Structure formats: structure tokens, C-alpha cells
Amino acid sequence: MRKTKIICTMGPSTDKDDVMEQLVREGMDVARFNFSHGPHDEQRGRIQKLRELRKKYDRPVAALLDTKGPEIRLGCFKDGKVSLEEGQIFTFTNKDIEGTNEHVSITYKELYKDVQPGGHILVDDGLVDLEVQDISGKDIVCKVINAGVIGDKKGVNVPGANLKMPFISKKDHEDLLFGIQEGFDFVAASFTRTADDIREVRKILKDNGGEEIQIIAKIENQQGVDNIDEIIEAADGIMIARGDMGVEIPPEYVPVIQQKIIQKVYTAGKPVITATQMLDSMISHPRPTRAEATDVANAIFQGTSATMLSGETAAGKYPVQALQMMSRIAEHMEENIEYNTIFKKTDRNENPDITNAIAHATCLTAIDLKAQAILAVTKSGSTAHMMSKHRPGCLIGACTSSERVLRQLNLSWGVYPMLIREEYSSEILCLRAIEAAQKHKLVKVGDTVVFAGGVPLGIPGRTNMIRVCIVD
């Protein structure tokens, strides 16, 4: 059974026929809804369909709302696009004008305050590079470094600039309220720069009844990388969004940044997602390149909790095949990981509390006894997250009475979430956990399982008991 979780992005391709249903059947763990595209009515139809499929297949597929975030875009051109030549002068202005091959408006009107001569402005994922020559009033005068064609509303990146633009736009605020109303499990906060950005999102969620929604910080610029420690502490998980990161930051730096962030988040006992262009060629082709397969495998080897498919499932020709391929790569990689070695290297001192100590002891017991599974009863999910951090090798059956926590646990590496009702006796609770594991075919008669729970029961953060049981 695959331990690495897979996120699939919803879009036009998943709207066709029974594609979303096939993705659920083939093991999609989290469905990502990209709110940079598609109105609320369109997204509402998709989340409703997902709810129906959860019920039909009894699978706790989580729903993730990915915000548009504080992005910068060009205005529109008179003819829809212009061709820029190397060496020519081109101006970005905060005036609302029709674009020509000499100038264009920009959505962030205060950008002229945040850039300096010598800095660079990149358009359309970095395909066109312009160097800032002068700030003339509120206009940014640039010289074209790389020639190319730019068109209406193309994205703009400003590497190295400390942008002061608001983190939550009016659209993002409306999308968050929509996410609360529709019962989303996660919010992915795009272009997270500081811990304050996460706190701002959390306040909106809490003030509007969405305090149970977990926040995934998307790291995709230098500010986010520089402030990664405080962001990890404030967020519930991290997404390494390598698309914009590879534009904002030199591409040769991205692999090392990815490795370091995965290690930091992994050590903190929180989920970490590696995203963007993982099987990008499968948008158009039925098989990935060897480099893409290696990229997925390398992220798993580094310790990622989940890998993500973006355009491959949202707009590609082979969405189901992309999920199947990513799943096969993950399963084969997991067969070749030395879990005992990883466990010995896990630093317990990063989180010196009762939950982490119990999680470590439970995993150690499971390794020593070669247990078939760990069964953890968890109210908030924190115990299962910590056990996932230790990579015990065996599956972690996480039992919870909360349907929201059930789905959120589906993002954690090696965790198989199961729904059980609350009990007020540790004996009965252990029995219910084993029954659930048997029902889901995690264990069979004669298997050794290690059970972890809390007394008194039902209180988050109170896991303090370990038991070894033989299934009978």
C-alpha cells in the first residue's frame, strides 16, 4: 500500500466523463482546486461531485483550496500581444492604459516603490527578462534583455524585490469564505512571505467559522525561503511550489532549497508537499521523461509527504495515467528505502513533548517487534503526524471520530485514516481500532499491532499510552 500521498488538481480534464471518479478509484488522496482559474459556480460543481464520490467509494479524499495569492499581472495590449526586441526600452506604468510595444499597465500600482535600477522584471514565467533602468515618477523604465512576445494579463515576477503588496486580496477573501461554506479541508496560501501572512489567513478562517481548516503555506519566492523557519511554525504544512520559485530564484538553487525545506518540515512533524512540473510532459504524452520519473523518486527519497500533479490532471490528455505513473514510482521507491536507518537519524529533540516522545516510542516498538501496523487514536491528528515523521516502515492506522480530521490525515505520509466512534474505555477503544483495521484490510488474525491512545480519552494532545496486541 502506497505511503506517499498524491494530490491531483481539478480542471477541465477532470470534468470530462468519469475522470474524477477514476482518480478517486486509482488512489487520489487530495483534490486540489485552483482558484486562480474558474468561478465559484464551476468549483462548487466539482466539490459537490467529490463529496458524492467520497460517499460512493468510502474514501476520505481531502479538498484543498489553492488561493490566487498576491500575484502581479500585465494589463491588456491593443492587439492582444506585442513583440519585444533585445535592447529596446519598455515601460511598466501604474496608469490604466492600452498596451503598446512601448509600454503597458500593471496590476500592482505601487511596484515602482519596490524596485530599483539594476533589478529585473520577468514576464510570462521568465520567458522575457527586462532590466530596470530608471524610475520616472510612477513609471518603471526598463531595457529588454531577452527578446520575446508578451500578451494580455501575463504573469510578472520581480526576483529579489521586497514587495509590499497586500497578502490577501478581495478575491482571496471571497474565496476563503467560499471555502468555509463548502467545507474545504485545506487552504494553500500562495506566495507566503512571512508567518504574518499565515496568521492573516487563519484570522479570516477563525472569524468566519473555518478554524478547523488547515493552512498549507506555499513557498515560491525568496522572501518565503528566507523566513521558512517562522512560516513552518505558523502553518500546518508546507508546499514547495517550484514553478514560480524557479522564476523568482535561479533554477540551479531550487534543488538544494527543496531538499532543505523538506528536511525542516519533516523534522517539525508536519506534512510537506513537493509540487509543479513533476510529470509535466504527461500533459501531452502518455509516458513521462526519465528525468521526471527521477524527480518524483528523488522528492520521495528526500522525505516529502506528498507529490502533486498540476496541469497533468487539470488540463492534460492523460490525467488518470499520470496518477497511475506517479503511484507506481512512489511504490517502487518506497520498497527501496531503508526505514530503520531513517528512524535512527530522526531528531527527537526538535519537539521535546509528550506526544513526540510517545510517537517515537510507539514507532521504536513497532520496528523492534516487526509489527504489521501502528494503530493510533487521535482527536486532532497531531499524534499520527508525529508518528509519520519517524517513518516506521509499517502503515499507521489513524483512528479518529472527526470526519474533517479523517480527511486531513490523508495528507500525512504512511497514514491510513479510519473513522471510529468515540469510546470512554481504553480497552474498548483498542478493540474498535483493531476492528477498523481488519475492516480496511490493514491487519489480519495473528498480526502484531502497536496501539497508542490517550487516557483520559478524547482530549487533543493527551496521547500517553502504548499497548502491544495480537489480532485474534
Q: Predicted segment positions?
A:
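Non-catalytic helical/linker scaffolds that mediate oligomerization, partner binding
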Residues: 1-472
